[in-house]
């Protein structure tokens, strides 16, 4: 998984190779997010909170397809606020129920989006805001 931080909230980006994890991370970073870890993220639980950490061997490195591996500053450890699974368009529900995933006993909001969509960075930010402020409308 790749992880970025947006306003102190860790966002895990998961998906198969080529699903757009690093690309979406790059677009989020270009919009003000910070890099935590690209391609591999260590997870741990402390006081009931899930944390994402960067392995030292890849600290500050981001793979940019077509450019190469670039050195960036990074945030080495953040609390995880949400998980985004990057899936095929056919696997994205139009009006999904709110979902959570339990990792090491901690429940985390989970969303499924197409990572290569132009709107993917906006969807990540919107979902974080809606989750944090309880803005979801029940269908």
Task: Indicate where each model-derived feature is located.
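Short, acidic/polar N-cap/turn motifs at the starts of alpha helices
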Residues: 1-3, 40, 98
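Conserved NTP phosphate-binding and transfer environment spanning the P-loop NTPase/kinase superfamily
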Residues: 77-139
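Glycine-rich phosphate-binding P-loop
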Residues: 8-29
């Amino acid at each position: 998984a790749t992880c970025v931080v947006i306003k102190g909230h860790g966002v895990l980006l998961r998906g198969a190779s080529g699903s757009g994890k690093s690309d979406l991370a790059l677009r989020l970073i270009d919009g003000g997010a910070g890099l935590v870890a690209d391609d591999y993220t260590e997870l741990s639980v402390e006081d009931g909170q899930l944390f994402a950490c960067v392995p030292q061997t890849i600290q500050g490195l981001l793979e940019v397809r077509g450019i190469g591996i670039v050195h960036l500053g990074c945030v080495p450890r953040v609390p995880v606020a949400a998980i985004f699974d990057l899936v095929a368009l056919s696997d994205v529900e139009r009006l999904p129920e709110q979902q959570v995933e339990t990792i090491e006993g901690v429940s985390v909001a989970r969303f499924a989006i197409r990572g290569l969509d132009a709107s993917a960075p906006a969807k990540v930010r919107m979902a974080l805001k809606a989750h944090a402020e309880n803005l979801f409308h029940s269908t």
